[in-house]
Amino acid sequence: MLTRKTHRKHPPSVRVETGPAAGDDVDIRTRVLIALRWTAMSKFLGQLVSWTVTLYVIRILSPEDYGLMAMATVPIALFYLLNTAGLDAVLVQKRELSDQLRAQIFGIVIVLNLLIFIVFLGTAPWIAAFYREPRLTAIIRILALQFILLPVETLPQAQLEREINFGRRSIVELVTIVAGSLMALTLARAGFGVWTLVWGSLTTTAIRMAGLNLIQRSLCWPRFSLGGMKTDLLFGRAATVDRALRFALADTDRFIGGRFFGNTLLGYYAVANDLASLPVNKLTGLINSIALPAFARAQSGPGGARAALLTMTRLMSLLAFPFFLGISSIAPEISTLLLGPKWQAATVPLQLLSLVMPLRMLMNALQPFLWGVGRPETSVSIFLIGALSMPLAFLVGAQWGPVGLSLAWALAYPVVFLVSIAHARTLSGVLVTDILRTMERPILASLLMYAVVFAVKHYVAFGQSEHILHLASLVLVGAVTYIGSMLVLDRGACRESSEALRAFFGVRPYSYDPRPLSKNDETPLAGH
C-alpha cells in the first residue's frame, strides 16, 4: 500500500538529563548494531511484501484516488507530528523517568489527541471546501479516527526505543506492514477506490497499536496535571517546533499542489514523490545507525564534530547519489513496466524529484547530528530557512502543474541545502567546500553512470524496453559503471563504506573512526 509517508517521530538525540553514562558506550554500540540487524531483516521482508502489493494497487487505482488521499493526509500528517507535543522524546531520553511523569505525559497525550480528533470532525468540511473537493469531508473524518488510537501506543513505543529494543518492535512492524498491505490488496481488488488507502491506513495504525501493547506492557492510569513539568514541556516545545518546520519544508508541496491543480494531477505528483522519497527514510536510518558512535564522540576532541559530520556525509553520498540518480535514469522504464500506461504522466516528476533526494537525505541526517552535539536551536534555525523558502518555490512551480512543482524542488532545494550547511558552519567547523569535497567523487561517478545508462538505452540495441529483463540489464550496467568509477576515483572511501556495512551485518568489527582526510580534502576549520 502506498499512502503518504509521514515523518516518523524519532526523538532527537539531545543530552539533557538523558542518556547513559560514558562507560556504557561500548555496550550501547553493540546493542544498537544487533538491534538494527533485526530491524534490517524485518524491514526487508516487510518492504518486499509492501512494495509488491503497492505496485499492484497502483496499477488498479487511479491518479484521482491517490490525489484525494494526498489532499486528506496533508493536515492529518501535520497533526500526527504534533500529537504528543514533543513529549514522546522526553519519555525516551530523560535519564530519571518517574511513574508520575509517565502518567502526566500519558494524560496530556490523551487530551491532545481527543482535541485533535474533535477539531477534524468540525473542520473537515472547511478543508474540503479549500480544495473544492466535497468527498474529502468523509475521508478526513475517517482518517481522524487514528488520533483515538495513537495515545495508546505512545508509552510502549517510547519504552522500546528507550531500551533500544528494536528486535521485538521489528516483529510488530513486520506484522503491521503485511496486514496493512493485505487489507489494501483486498479492498483494491474489490473496487473500493480511494477507500482502499483510507482503510489500509487505519488498519496499519490499529494493528501497530495492538502489537506494541502486546509485546510491551507500559500502560498506566493517566494523570491530568502539569505540576513539575516546566523543563519537560520546554523540551517538548523545541521538538514540536522542529517537526513543524520540517513539515513546512517537505510537505507544503501537496498542500499547494492540491489547491492549484486538483486531485488527478496531484495524484501523478504524489505517486512520483512517494516512490522517490520513501527510500530516503530507509537509507537515512541505515547510515545514521552506522554513524551513531561517531555522533556520540562528536565533542570528544578538537575537530571531532567536523570529522563526524564529514564521515556521515561521505558514507551517505556513496549510497545516495547512485541510488537516486539511478532511479532518475530509469524512470521511464519504472513507469512503463511497474506502474502501467496510465501513470506515464508521473515519469518526468519522478525523474526530477529523484535528482534532489540525495540532498534531502543528507539534510535529514544533519538534524540528529545537531541535536547530538547539544544544539537543537541550530537545527530549528536551519529548518526555518527551508520552511520559509520552499513554500515560495512551490507557489511559483505549481503554476506549471506536477512538472513545475518537481522543478521547484530540483532548482530551489540545492540552494536551501547550501545555505543551511553554511549556517551550521560555526557549530560543526565544516565549511561548505568541505561538504562539497566529500560529495564530489560520488556525484561524478553517478553522473557518469547516468550518461552510460542513457547511452545504452538510446544508442545501443539492448532488449525490448517493455520487458523486465531490459530494466534489470540497465540496473546492472549502472551498478557496474558506478562501482568501477568509484574504485578509480576513491578506493579508500569504497573500503571505508564496505567495512562499515560489514560491521553492521556482523561480519567484522568496525572502529567507526573517520578515515584521515587526504591533503586534497583538508581545509582549515571554520573560525581557525
Residue ranges and their predicted role:
Residues 29, 90-99, 149-172, 190, ...:
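Membrane-interface junctions at transmembrane-helix termini in multi-pass inner-membrane proteins
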Residues 2-18, 44-48, 107-132, 137-138, ...:
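Alpha-helical transmembrane segments of multi-pass membrane transport and lipid-handling proteins
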Residues 10-28, 32, 167, 210-255, ...:
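Interhelical loop/hinge segments that connect adjacent transmembrane helices in multipass membrane
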Residues 35-50, 176, 197-200, 204, ...:
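Transmembrane helical elements of multi-pass membrane transporters/channels
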Residues 56-73, 129, 137, 164-167, ...:
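Membrane-interface helix-loop junctions in multi-pass transport and translocation proteins
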Residues 93-109, 268-384:
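Specific pore-lining/lateral-gate transmembrane helices of multi-pass inner-membrane transport
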Residues 2-19, 27-87, 108-124, 141-146, ...:
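Signature of the first transmembrane helix
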Residues 1-25, 422-426, 430-432, 451-528:
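Membrane-proximal transmembrane or re-entrant/amphipathic helices at the cytosolic face
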